[in-house]
Amino acid sequence: NIALPLQIEGQSKKMIKEKVNEFLEKVGLNHREKYYPQQLSGGEKQRVSIARALVKNPLVILADEPTGNLDPNVSDEILDLLEIATDSGAAVLMSTHNFPLIQPRKKRFIELDEGRLVTQ
């Protein structure tokens, strides 16, 4: 699953394995390397999705509720990964209903209520 973007790009099997292992570790799933998606919990599937999105170091990341179904500790770890992506030059546009999770991070955010701008 995480390897797919790298396979499409035609990367070597060795490089793909290294990158997949690196990102499985980053999202705390290195112990689940051989599992099929149906064997993973909802939160674990969410973390695999984040790893797949980050594995190619994209310039733009669109994240719709990336911390949904995750416990608070894993949510913080995922936001840390997204912050690392921004530090590397990526733009992250994230939607969330969990304002207390993102507010302390002091990143630029906008708040919408019924489609209207409330805070910028």
Predicted segment positions?
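Conserved ABC ATPase signature
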Residues: 36-40, 44
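Conserved catalytic motifs of ABC-family nucleotide-binding domains
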Residues: 57
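Helix N-cap at the start of a conserved alpha-helix in ABC-type nucleotide-binding domains
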Residues: 72-74
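ABC nucleotide-binding domain "signature" region
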Residues: 15-27
